């Protein structure tokens, strides 16, 4: 993938919003079948323009209105907010206190910077294949719980374009949830607690909740290769001292000695498991709980959610198919059938897909000179000729399931009415 030059972004965005952005699918998503009157019209969008100019409370009548505005403004970033009681672009005309956020998808934001205390390869905004496994585990753990523990059907996972992932839960019942219920859900999904000053961030009680057991089973599939080989979390004294801080002091000396005699993280982990197991058998009710090995695995691998993003109904989150202005990468949907294969470094940049389009356009110009073709039809075909196509397909698959589910619900309702 070619390098992205941020100085080219203004020109690239013009082309992207004119010829490549998947407007029809995007509108189809946020309109939700047009079942609820004014649902799309009451949705808040925010645009971040060049030089960090930020405009909130944008709203649009229809797909055409949205397209025109995006092509006029060429936003560097698009965020999606709640569905309000009134049109957001008229919020200043509404009586004080009457303008209220009413519905929104339940959203989750997982950012790699929140793992800086446990990843050794990168820090802050940087990511690499060695630490991306954290995002793979996060998607697997959170998605399994949303699907199986809560019964949520319509979950859209999206790469942020730089260092994290977002999830949009779009079931109709979920969009209506109160802030209190959202807080309860995100609390259920949170285990790693405490700021930078807190060394031990995971505390398990003797009774292990099924959610934790299932999460551990997912982590186990990745732990050896991710934590012991790639992150090498027991490589040297500095790294193993961090782990010793998570276990009772009474076993520190024994572990120090065995760690010094061992040659690598794999061997040291085996020693730790043996010593911890022996300790657990001897002391049933220690304040550290009986699950030392699991607590370490969870602290190093369990998802770290930004709680505030999930609990607030009026919280804005970056839109799918927005462009990251620093990396140039498109914020693309992730195929849940291929989570392990998803590679953020192969996600196309805006410069790459615009070059692809240029190359194709040059070849086709002669052919199309004689053909009258509508701009919409032309654009629908345009993204299909670029590396964006497979990601739009993932999005379309998600939308098809949403449509099927909605039609099923409408049929159920009409059958019930017939019974009366």
Curated annotation (Swiss-Prot):
Chain span(s) of sequence motif Zinc knuckle motif: 121-131
Stated consequence of mutating residue 318 to A: Decreases the binding affinity for NTPs. Loss of primase activity
Acidic residues: bias regions: 363-373
Gene Ontology molecular function, alphabetical: DNA-directed RNA polymerase activity; magnesium ion binding; ribonucleotide binding; zinc ion binding
Residues reported in the UniProt entry to bind Mn(2+) 1: 109, 111
Post-translational modification N-acetylmethionine, affected residues: 1
Record has Electron transport as a keyword: no
Effect caused by changing residue 324 to A: Strongly decreases primase activity, which can be partially rescued by increasing primase concentration
UniProt: Mg(2+) 2 binding residues: 109, 111, 306
BP-aspect Gene Ontology terms: DNA replication initiation; DNA replication, synthesis of primer
Listed GO CC annotations: alpha DNA polymerase:primase complex; membrane; nucleoplasm
Active site: 44, 109, 111
Record key words, sorted: Acetylation, Disease variant, DNA replication, DNA-directed RNA polymerase, Dwarfism, Magnesium, Manganese, Metal-binding, Nucleotidyltransferase, Primosome, Transcription, Transferase, Zinc
Annotated effect of mutating residue 44 to A: Strongly decreases primase activity, which can be partially rescued by increasing primase concentration
Binding-site list for Mn(2+) 2: 109, 111, 306
Binding-site residues, Zn(2+): 121-122, 128, 131
The enzyme's E.C. designation: 2.7.7.102
Domain of life per record: Eukaryota
Disease: Primordial dwarfism-immunodeficiency-lipodystrophy syndrome: An autosomal recessive syndrome characterized by growth failure with in utero growth retardation and severe postnatal growth restriction, severe microcephaly, absence of subcutaneous fat, and significant haematological and immune dysfunction. Patients have hypo- or agammaglobulinemia, lymphopenia, anemia, and thrombocytopenia. Most affected individuals die in early childhood from either respiratory or gastrointestinal infections.
Annotated protein name in UniProt: DNA primase small subunit
Organism: Homo sapiens
